[in-house]
Structures are given as C-alpha cells and as structure tokens.
C-alpha cells in the first residue's frame, strides 16, 4: 500500500543542503529543478535514503501547504552504523547535542543542516542473537 517515504525539507536556499549531503555523506543529486538563477527543488539519494529540498519561494502558491512549510524546522532521524564516523563528517557543522546515550540504548548525535533542520544520527544498540 505505501511504498516509500521521503522527507521534503523547505529552505531559503537549496544549494547549501545539496553541498552538505553530497560532500559530507556521499549522497548524489538525482533531480534539480531551476527557479530563476538558483535551484528551486532537488532530490538526493545515497542508495538507501532519499531527501528532497524545496525553497519557500517554490511553495508560495501551494495554498495551505505554503504556510505549513514556513513553520519548520523538521526533525530527521537517520540510523547509522558508526556514530564516530558521522561525528567526523560533521566537523564545522552546528552540533546541537554531542554524542550521548538515549533511554533506548542508542548512541546519538544531533546536528543542524544548513537549512536549519535537525538531523538525529543514531547508532542503535546491537540486537542479541536468538
């Protein structure tokens, strides 16, 4: 019934988000739609995770969705295999919460991506073999 879920992050400018994900985490830009002299919409993919970015300007004619998009930021939860590698990739990025253990046993670090959205990188605890 439901095949896929992809967050759309609304931002003032798409380009900083593209640079963040492609340079730090190896994502590929799969779609770019121009909006005047800049990118108005883009999709990124790393083979497992897909993200989309759209400018607030591009949302201005979207009726009630335009107002909702302006209320952000979004929170994105990303499961990772090595939290220390993620921390290194986040150098020169605003860290909101450094590596910590959660109540469910995960090791997490929270950062703000260039558009102001929160990204929670989580290394979940190993599952016992049964």
Show the residue positions of the predicted features.
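Short glycine-/small-residue motifs
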Residues: 118-121
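Vicinal oxygen chelate
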Residues: 1-8, 28-78, 87-112, 123-130
């Amino acid at each position: 019934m439901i095949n896929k879920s992809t967050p759309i992050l609304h931002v003032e400018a798409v380009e900083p988000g593209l640079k963040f994900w492609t340079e730090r985490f190896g994502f590929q830009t799969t779609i770019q739609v121009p909006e005047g002299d800049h990118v108005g919409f883009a999709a990124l993919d790393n083979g497992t995770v897909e993200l989309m970015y759209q400018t607030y300007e591009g949302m201005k004619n979207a009726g009630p969705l335009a107002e909702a998009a302006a209320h952000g930021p979004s929170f994105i939860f990303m499961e990772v295999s090595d939290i220390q590698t993620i921390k290194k990739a986040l150098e020169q990025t605003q860290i909101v919460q450094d590596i910590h253990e959660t109540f469910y046993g995960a090791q997490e670090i929270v950062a703000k991506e260039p558009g102001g959205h929160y990204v929670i990188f989580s290394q979940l605890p190993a599952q016992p073999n049964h």
